[in-house]
Amino acid sequence: MNNSNRLRLTWISYFSYALTGALVIVTGMVMGNIAEYFNLPIASMSNTFTFLNAGILISIFLNAWLMEIIPLKRQLVFGFILMLIAIAGLMVGHNLMIFSISMFILGVVSGITMSIGTFLITHMYEGRQRGSRLLFTDSFFSMAGMIFPVAAAILLARHIEWYWVYACIGLLYVGIFVLTLCSEFPVLGHKATDQSKPVAKEKWGMGVLFLAIAALCYILGQLGFIQWVPEYATKTFNMDISQAGQLVSNFWISYMIGMWVFSFILRFFDLQRIVTVLAALATLSMYMFVSTNNPEHLSYYILALGFVSSAIYTTLITLGSLQTKVSSPKLVNFILTCGTVGTMLTFVVTGPIVANSGVHAALATANGLYLTVFVMCLILGFFTKHRSHGHVTH
């Protein structure tokens, strides 16, 4: 593979994470406007976003096998067509069924693209370089989380319809589409070389179970927290939508900076030990945010939370890919799928909590999930295989 092609594939991975980040994170900003558009209470409206998360989950799960059947390039081109259909559905369809179907299609496109992006990085890079590359790739998720809530707030403040936010997000896939047409992709499945055969036979080990639980709890906790921060800030502290949007942007700015910092730091530390420390610090930072009664402190705590939690999910994926001697697409997709289950459950879990006990209870639940991540990372230390495979020295 020549360097220019590798660079194009790497940028496809970057944009794939930005696309998923934009779709998932912007939900909290537009939810109120969409609820008003369909004349539904916000707690009920949140349940319809499960279609987005379900689409992401199903496509990531199935793509572990589809990547070996349908060429990656063909999947991404087909994804572009689906993206156009979904955004057109949001714009011209004025009923809840069309909205739900369009969100599901967006989820499918996002999941396919993200699973391909993750595989490309794990395929092209090895050892600790894989971890730092994945972390930098994941920073585009948070970069989108920084940019699109601000863009959404600007559009909504000017009384521009909410669906134009999704049209803006669709521009990311235009970039993916153009790069895809110019790139050559690795071949998987029966057409690939025999090097991929040992991957299917190698046992994953118990460590993968703890990584999977940690990935699920982390994403569920993170999104359960950040999706309700705007509602919490406006209702509890009487902030306006711009101030609430700034809180969310602060989180993702800090998250992005943390990723860049840790993409250099991680190569000097054992991945299991550092992810355990980061999970503990993230749990403490979220507790401080949820517990404070001073609105002036919210920005400090959410900045700290964004920074220390930035490397957790990507490190979990990297540790998963290092549980076998040869990187397995199915193992990586399994960890991704578990994380995406957390995405899908975000409003299924937090919606009823908000309806029955209020937004603060949902944030406290997210804090408990972060504590679970810490416990899983701690236990992982007794079962992980990444040291015995020699990956720690790469």
Swiss-Prot record:
Its membrane topology is listed as: Multi-pass membrane protein
Q: Which GO terms describe its cellular component?
A: plasma membrane
Record-linked PROSITE patterns: MFS (PS50850)
Q: Name one GO molecular function term.
A: transmembrane transporter activity
List the keywords (alphabetical). Cell inner membrane, Cell membrane, Membrane, Transmembrane, Transmembrane helix
The record ties this protein, via SUPFAM superfamilies, to: MFS general substrate transporter
Gene3D superfamilies found in the cross-reference section: MFS general substrate transporter like domains (1.20.1250.20)
Residues annotated as transmembrane: 11-31, 51-71, 76-96, 101-121, 134-154, 162-182, 206-226, 246-266, 274-294, 302-322, 334-354, 363-383
Give the UniProt subcellular location, in the record's own words. Answer: Cell inner membrane
What family name appears in the similarity comment? Belongs to the major facilitator superfamily. TsgA family.
Protein known as: Protein TsgA homolog
What taxonomic ancestry is recorded?
Bacteria, Pseudomonadati, Pseudomonadota, Gammaproteobacteria, Enterobacterales
- State the gene name recorded for this protein: tsgA
